[in-house]
Amino acid sequence: MSAAVEIQHVHILGAGRMGQGIALAFAYAGLRVTLIDFKERDPAARSAFAAAARGEIVRQLQTQVVFGRITEAQAAETMARIVIVDRERAREGLAEGEIVFEAVPEVMEAKQTAFAWLGEHAGADVLFASTTSTFLVTELQQVVVHPGRLLNAHWLNPAHLMPLVEVSRSDATAKETVERVVALLRRVGKVPVVCAPSAGYIVPRIQALAMNEAARMVEEGVASAEDIDTAIRTGFGLRFSVLGLLEFIDWGGCDILYYASHYLARAIDPRFLPAAIVSDNMREGRDGLRNARGFYDYADVDVPAYLHKRLGEFSRLLDSRGLAPVFNAVSVSVSVSASSVPNQTTLAVSKADYGPR
């Protein structure tokens, strides 16, 4: 098997919040899902947990109904694709399974137990994707029998809504495993990115730095928590939903980041010193758009068309958030006095109310 289109049935090991969100993402896209409650429970507790998990998924679907994204019938159809079972009932289906997303608690012993159990009951061709945000794929591959069939697939919460899934592979991961998982994720509307086995993947690593810096600013009295969050929502966050971080370095010019970083390092802390690659780009003239090379190569790019596209995306985003600049009439009277200095124009400007911003 080589094409993700062949995958029609997804198993998810671990029925907590992340497992429920992933189950909803696949069921919403039309796939059958078996959500496995892996924790040992007595019959009453097992039944209660399954009911609670099902109730939470239904609540998420009802939210989409309220927002007008789906109908009641579509919500019911989505829910009908999800079966919640305990580990005993899951065994038979796993033997004929296609892919398992592991979503048990972030404890290595729990991961080891889960993969040992999967090794006993999953079929020979089943692919494994751990949703861990903590352990490297290289660490998990040490506890599985077939490391070539394992990779990490890190979803962001809420999993059924956030498009990004960070796929982390190692040299031991088979190329076909990566291709099939990436194709499957794209098929259900996700946006997979592939990264090396590195602590924090991409988003959590950048996010941790940004969140800690925001916390430090509160600590230092730079601004209130509310104003910092407003700045992020209406500035930083808006900008980087259209432009990537590295794309923005090229957009403004590497020199801006380079000199700003040195200033902040002197004024605040050496942690702000630029990355070595930023210094290298400065030295080698890879300054971004202005000389057609930076983190990206713009030699064959129609730069005016590219800029127009990005600005259009940004304008539409501002419109959708109610943050677009407000245009109101400005009356301008122009008079030229006979006694005035030649070519001197006197402007009288009265500005109307510009409205809320």
Tell what function each PLM region has.
Residues 31-32, 146, 165-198, 210-238:
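Internal alpha-helical scaffold of NAD(P)-dependent oxidoreductase catalytic cores
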Residues 34-36, 83-85, 101, 129, ...:
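Hydrophobic/aromatic beta-strand patches that form the interior of the parallel beta-sheet core
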Residues 38-97:
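Conserved N-terminal Rossmann-fold NAD(P) cofactor-binding segment
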Residues 1-60:
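NAD(P)+-binding Rossmann beta1-loop-alpha1 motif at the extreme N-terminus of oxidoreductases
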Residues 6-9, 97, 125:
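Phosphate-coordination loops involved in phosphoryl transfer and adenosine-cofactor binding
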Residues 2-6, 190-197, 220, 225-337, ...:
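NAD(P)-dependent Rossmann-like dehydrogenase/reductase catalytic/cofactor-binding core
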Residues 99, 104-165:
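Rossmann-like NAD(P)(H) cofactor-binding subdomain of soluble oxidoreductases
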